[in-house]
Amino acid sequence: MSKTAITSYPKERINILFLENISDKAVQQFKQNGYTNVRRLGGALSEEELIREIGNVHLLGIRSKTHIPARVLAAATKLQAIGCFCIGVNQVDLKAATRSGVVVFNAPYSNTRSVAELVIGAAIMLIRRIPDKNKAAHEGVWLKDAKGSFELRGKTLGIIGYGNIGSQVSVLAEALGMKV
């Protein structure tokens, strides 16, 4: 016999607001877990719009474009937590959030691999002169020679900053035969 966990506040009374195109999967996940008052808006809201919208919100999900200053937090009388679905939390006034008792969390590894792949992709694009060749091809000129085109293999890559992203760039670069 399984028992349903008793919460201190009924899930169906908790209001959740997601901004900036937070994934539909997140909305579905919350709804599947009994949270019925979940709204998702496509973009970031201005400070004035946030003040109008946030009064009955218990959980706010944002990305990097939405800014939550003290004035917005003062209007957020029911807010319990802000989920920043991005690397940092610098868009939230953390001191004001702490004074208001609002928990702020982020997703520090959410795009680490994506950024590392873009770095490697940009390196390939530049070393192979893809922008020049693409421009020429669109002008009807096919540059068939390989002069000035190189491979990443054997090249040396210097990484400034060896945090989450830098270490992932290193893994990908080494897999391509680069010296890091």
Which stretches of residues belong to each language-model region?
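Short, well-ordered beta-strand segments
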Residues: 15-17, 61, 83, 158
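Phosphate/diphosphate ligand-binding glycine-rich loop within oxidoreductases
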Residues: 39, 57-136, 146-153
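Residues at the C-terminal ends
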Residues: 32, 55, 97-99, 175
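Rossmann-fold NAD(P)-dependent oxidoreductase module
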Residues: 29, 118, 122, 168, ...
